[in-house]
């Protein structure tokens, strides 16, 4: 028997169920068997546990079924009625049941039974339509349990299908509200991120402005200091020049007096001793003046050397100030890089928090309203299994 024939589990119509003999399998057993086989195939395709399968996942059945990749691709396209590129569990189960078709025992049924079965809407298709009407066909990751519960209620307790629809509607409403709240939170986070970027940009502009103002202030201060020192040195230089000029004038006057006394020496031999004493005094004064002149020249030389040293110190100071400004600029650039790194880490933390929050919200929903237990005289419970989808 081929794997395709092992997957054939038809949905009996009302006519077939009413005319079936006691030795044939019950419709519930056939449906459960078909659902279990479809689920096994779906799990074989969805090895990552995504909750849906793609065309590439469908091609993994090549090792399980005697079908070529082209045939598997054709099967996937026939099942993908929405043309969205993937199949949910219910779409796979319902489409696979229709694609596999009836077994050999159903081929001999009468034409009237076949027409009656075609008119009947399969339970799984009806369940899929209800999920699509509620907008929940893409909300639930695993829909096998819900489909099984729906089929059992359809078979055993059709009057409870309305209750299950209300529970599904209530659950879908809360899930949609949660998704809207998540969208609002994401919008708020994006707005906060934009505000943060704007604040960082403003801080960067303020730092640039402060750096420019500090640079201009230091340049103005250095110019003022250089101007004041230059004026002071020029004033001292003019003072020393005046003193030197006065000393030279005094020296010339003394020399003139010496010449005058020398010319009068012949006429005043009697006053020779006195003139010699005066001459000696004048010579002493001349020597003192020369010493003062020498001292003045030495002081002038020292002033010139001091001016040169100060000029070199100014150059070194200007170089030092420029180096300090370069170091300060590098420090500000490093601070800016730190701010950018902090901003990147904040974005990464926000993305991780959003991903964790999306995962936690995907596996949580508001529990449905509990209904009282059935008080009828039946021996079995109206709630054969949990109605939760997970």
From Swiss-Prot:
Region annotation (Disordered) maps to 1-37, 206-234
One GO molecular function term?
A: calcium ion binding
Pfam families in UniProt = EF-hand_7
Highest taxon above the source species: Eukaryota
Where, if anywhere, are coiled coils annotated? 173-357
InterPro entries linked to this entry? Ca-binding_regulatory, EF-hand-dom_pair, EF_Hand_1_Ca_BS, EF_hand_dom
Instruction: Please indicate if the UniProt record lists Calcium as a keyword.
Output: yes
| Low complexity composition-biased segments | 1-27
Question: Which keywords does UniProt give here?
Answer: Calcium, Coiled coil, Metal-binding, Repeat
**Claim: Metal-binding is one of the keywords in the record:** yes
Q: Can you give the residue ranges of the EF-hand domain?
A: 33-66, 67-102
Recorded protein name is EF-hand calcium-binding domain-containing protein 4A
Give the species: Danio rerio
* Source taxonomy: Eukaryota, Metazoa, Chordata, Craniata, Vertebrata
Name of the coding gene: cracr2b
